[in-house]
Every structure is written in C-alpha cells, then in structure tokens.
Amino acid sequence: MQIMLCAISNIASGNCSEDCKYCTQSAHVKTDIQKYRRKELSQIVLEAKMAKKNEALGFCLVTAGLGLDDEKLEYVCEAAKAVQKEVPNLLLIACNGMASVEQLKELKKAGIFSYNHNLETSKEFFPQICTTHTWESRFQTNLNAKEAGLMLCCGGIYGMGESEEDRLSFRKSLQELQPFSTPINFFIANENLKLQVPRLNADEALKIVRDTKEALPQSVVMVAGGREVVLRERQYEIFQAGAGAIVIGDYLTTKGEEPSQDIIKLKEMGFTFASECH
C-alpha cells in the first residue's frame, strides 16, 4: 500500500483574533507558544528540504489569523515561490484562513496546489467552539477554493464534546464539498484552553477514520493532530481503517512523532510513499 506523507510549516504563529476554544494560537488564551508575524524564507525552504528528505509529498504553509489580507497574501506567495525554486517536487498546500476567489487564484499562480480550510465540526456544534466567525464563512471559503481551481483539503477536529449526530452532520457537509483530502485531528486538551473534555480512546478514533472513509471514498483520509497521543501503539491501525495519509513531524504548536520513526515503522510494515499525486 502506498501512503502520502505531509509536513507542516507554521510560517506565522499566534496572536490570532479568533476565539476558537480548541486553539492555542488564539489571542484570547494565555499560552507559552512561540509567536511571530513571519518566518524567514530561508527557514521555510530549509524545512521544505527536510520534509522532502523525510519522504513528504505535501508541504503546508500555515498562517494564524482569520484570513488573508494583502500583506499576508504577498508573503505566502513569496514563500511558495521560494520553496518551489529549491524543492520543485513538493505539492504545496496553503492554510491561511478565509480567502476570496481572487486571493486564492493568486495563490494558485504562485504554485499552490491545494487549499486547506477545515470546517472543524458540524454547523450545529460550531457556535459552541467559536463565536468570532461563522461556520458558513468557512464553508464559503472552501467553495471559493474550488472555484479558484485549487484542490481542496478540508476536514476537522473530533473529540471536542460533539455528539454522534454532530459527526454525521459534519461528514454530510464534507460530502457536499468532496475534498481531494480530508484531515482528521483528535482534540488534545491543554490546561490553558477553555475547552476541557475527556480524551477520545483509540477505538473511538479508529471508528472515526472508518466512518470518514465510508462517507468520502474518493477522498484521501489524512490523520493529523492527536494521532500519537490518542492512538499510541495502535496509531498505524489507521491505514486498515481507511487512512491514506498522515502528517509527519511537528504540528502547529505541538510535537509530533519524529519523522524518521514513522518512516522506519511504516517501511517495516511494507508501506511505500507517494512521490506524485494521482
């Protein structure tokens, strides 16, 4: 079985105006995460080279904040062009919040392959985890990305206190979008966050992967944040459950599995790594 590996570069971190209860980058909570307006292009390129060395096909340029403005758009485009020049075989993904069709077309021109903007959860449950913007505005950005000609990466976070009905509603909304890839994150509580709920267990997490693949058979199911903590020694069972991709290395503000450890284990299990996108 061939799987896709993706890596993340947090190129603008923290001080986000939004009040998403699951996120340590929100200015509404006090955390000790690194905060910076922009990462040096040379550092982004270095991280891209490391990602490629670690068998990654996807490389995601992530910025904190509600969405794109002119300055941030220019910066993400600069970063994309810099990475493309030095590491031409990576598929570039942008994750920059709300964006118009015109802004997304500019990203595509700069070499962005796919846009990631998660719905996070169901339309019904969303107001309980965020009050500073609407679920509908997130959905619209995904429609904008498709109109701009970008591939779509859209998923969300499980284990925030949502019901089984919420999960079903959430997946129905994803079915409307039919994303190229759909990331699954498992919420891990942080003492500084307002959201304090029991952690999912491994059986629940694997059921979520199975249910997602059943709902979205044509999408690449990607297991991302929380994989190591929630699934522990069972984390590689995700592929039997229907996953076709994982995020390797660190996440936005939390540590991930060392890329080399993932690669060693996956090779031992007989997996190969995608080097192009079908």
From Swiss-Prot:
<keyword id="KW-0479">Metal-binding</keyword>
<dbReference type="InterPro" id="IPR010722">
    <property type="entry name" value="BATS_dom"/>
</dbReference>
<dbReference type="Pfam" id="PF04055">
    <property type="entry name" value="Radical_SAM"/>
</dbReference>
<comment type="pathway">
    <text>Cofactor biosynthesis; biotin biosynthesis; biotin from 7,8-diaminononanoate: step 2/2.</text>
</comment>
<dbReference type="GO" id="GO:0009102">
    <property type="term" value="P:biotin biosynthetic process"/>
</dbReference>
<feature type="binding site">
    <location>
        <position position="60"/>
    </location>
    <ligand>
        <name>[2Fe-2S] cluster</name>
    </ligand>
</feature>
<dbReference type="GO" id="GO:0004076">
    <property type="term" value="F:biotin synthase activity"/>
</dbReference>
<dbReference type="InterPro" id="IPR007197">
    <property type="entry name" value="rSAM"/>
</dbReference>
<feature type="binding site">
    <location>
        <position position="95"/>
    </location>
    <ligand>
        <name>[2Fe-2S] cluster</name>
    </ligand>
</feature>
<feature type="binding site">
    <location>
        <position position="16"/>
    </location>
    <ligand>
        <name>[4Fe-4S] cluster</name>
    </ligand>
</feature>
<keyword id="KW-0001">2Fe-2S</keyword>
<keyword id="KW-0411">Iron-sulfur</keyword>
<comment type="similarity">
    <text>Belongs to the radical SAM superfamily. Biotin synthase family.</text>
</comment>
<dbReference type="InterPro" id="IPR006638">
    <property type="entry name" value="Elp3/MiaA/NifB-like_rSAM"/>
</dbReference>
<dbReference type="InterPro" id="IPR013785">
    <property type="entry name" value="Aldolase_TIM"/>
</dbReference>
<keyword id="KW-0004">4Fe-4S</keyword>
<keyword id="KW-0408">Iron</keyword>
<feature type="domain" description="Radical SAM core">
    <location>
        <begin position="1"/>
        <end position="227"/>
    </location>
</feature>
<dbReference type="GO" id="GO:0051537">
    <property type="term" value="F:2 iron, 2 sulfur cluster binding"/>
</dbReference>
<dbReference type="GO" id="GO:0005506">
    <property type="term" value="F:iron ion binding"/>
</dbReference>
<dbReference type="GO" id="GO:0051539">
    <property type="term" value="F:4 iron, 4 sulfur cluster binding"/>
</dbReference>
<dbReference type="InterPro" id="IPR024177">
    <property type="entry name" value="Biotin_synthase"/>
</dbReference>
<feature type="binding site">
    <location>
        <position position="20"/>
    </location>
    <ligand>
        <name>[4Fe-4S] cluster</name>
    </ligand>
</feature>
<feature type="binding site">
    <location>
        <position position="153"/>
    </location>
    <ligand>
        <name>[2Fe-2S] cluster</name>
    </ligand>
</feature>
<keyword id="KW-0808">Transferase</keyword>
<comment type="subunit">
    <text>Homodimer.</text>
</comment>
<dbReference type="Pfam" id="PF06968">
    <property type="entry name" value="BATS"/>
</dbReference>
<dbReference type="InterPro" id="IPR002684">
    <property type="entry name" value="Biotin_synth/BioAB"/>
</dbReference>
<keyword id="KW-0093">Biotin biosynthesis</keyword>
<keyword id="KW-0949">S-adenosyl-L-methionine</keyword>
<comment type="function">
    <text>Catalyzes the conversion of dethiobiotin (DTB) to biotin by the insertion of a sulfur atom into dethiobiotin via a radical-based mechanism.</text>
</comment>
<protein>
    <recommendedName>
        <fullName>Biotin synthase</fullName>
        <ecNumber>2.8.1.6</ecNumber>
    </recommendedName>
</protein>
<feature type="binding site">
    <location>
        <position position="23"/>
    </location>
    <ligand>
        <name>[4Fe-4S] cluster</name>
    </ligand>
</feature>
